[in-house]
């Protein structure tokens, strides 16, 4: 079980605890004001932060310290954890308010303002989010509508994650590819850790795998490898984020998710 489940979930999956989406929690510690500032200054905040990290993290003396401090700051304010589709559907079932809106990361990294891959959840934040750019394209969804969209994202290979706004309040679901800022900061450049791996890790059943390699093309983390000798794929557990989207393209159902905690010394 991850540290967040211990701290915010009483030893259970923290993102399935209703109180982490509650109005009572939302009203504490200046979260409404934090969200106002987050939306209004997203581009400014992240452009400056990434530039500063890029400058400092690779310095031999202070780099490690800066990276640790950045991770500590993210854990307190705004971080994400990967969630497979079956857990994501349970999260959706907890919600009374779900809104689909354009991805601020893709807007910043690709210039596409209409890429509606993100979901606001938790307390109804209509008034707060009305201040965001492109608020006119926001779409309120019923639970089953949201699940249908999320399943389609799963088949497209988009990895799902939940995000905090002043931890442990969870206010968003993201569905990411390599245009995501978190991916670029963490996976591509290894500047700092802003998203944590799922509660699971993927495993391949070689009795079922036919070596088609569809899953290999679906993995965004380079965790799946093909053996030309064995004509099968394997998942490198140390690199696996446990997102589970590789399963969506496996016609043989050869890939399953197992609890990460069952494997010694795997990274979170």
Where are these regions (language model features)?
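Iron-sulfur (Fe-S) cluster-binding modules
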Residues: 1-156, 225, 234, 253-268
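Local cysteine-cluster metal-coordination motifs and their immediate loop/turn environment
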Residues: 3-4, 101-112, 170-183, 207-221, ...
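Short, Lys/Arg-enriched charge-dense amphipathic segments
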Residues: 123-129, 181-195, 249-259
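Conserved adenosyl
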Residues: 132-137, 145-157, 161, 175-183, ...
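Ferredoxin-like iron-sulfur electron-transfer modules
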Residues: 161-168, 172, 189-218, 222-242, ...
């Amino acid at each position: 079980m991850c540290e967040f489940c211990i701290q915010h979930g009483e030893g259970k999956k923290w993102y399935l605890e209703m109180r982490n989406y509650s109005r009572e929690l939302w009203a504490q510690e200046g979260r409404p004001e934090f969200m106002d500032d987050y939306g209004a200054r997203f581009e400014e905040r992240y452009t400056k932060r990434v530039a500063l990290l890029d400058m400092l993290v690779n310095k031999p003396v202070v780099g490690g310290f800066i990276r640790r401090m950045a991770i500590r700051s993210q854990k307190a304010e705004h971080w994400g954890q990967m969630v497979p589709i079956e857990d994501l559907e349970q999260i959706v079932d907890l919600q009374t308010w779900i809104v689909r809106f354009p991805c601020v990361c893709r807007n910043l990294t690709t210039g596409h303002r209409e890429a509606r891959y993100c979901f606001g959840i938790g307390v109804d934040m209509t008034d707060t989010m009305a201040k965001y750019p492109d608020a006119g394209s926001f779409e309120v969804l019923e639970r089953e509508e949201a699940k249908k969209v999320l399943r389609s994202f799963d088949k497209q290979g988009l990895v799902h994650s939940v995000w905090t706004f002043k931890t442990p309040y969870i206010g968003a679901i993201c569905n990411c590819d390599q245009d995501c800022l978190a991916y670029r900061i963490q996976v591509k450049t290894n500047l700092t850790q802003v998203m944590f791996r799922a509660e699971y890790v993927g495993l391949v059943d070689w009795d079922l795998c036919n070596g088609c390699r569809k899953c290999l093309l679906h993995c965004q983390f380079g965790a799946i490898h093909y053996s030309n000798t064995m004509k099968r794929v394997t998942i490198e557990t140390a690199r696996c984020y446990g997102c589970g989207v590789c399963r969506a393209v496996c016609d043989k159902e050869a890939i399953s998710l197992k609890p990460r905690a069952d494997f010694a010394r795997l990274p979170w």
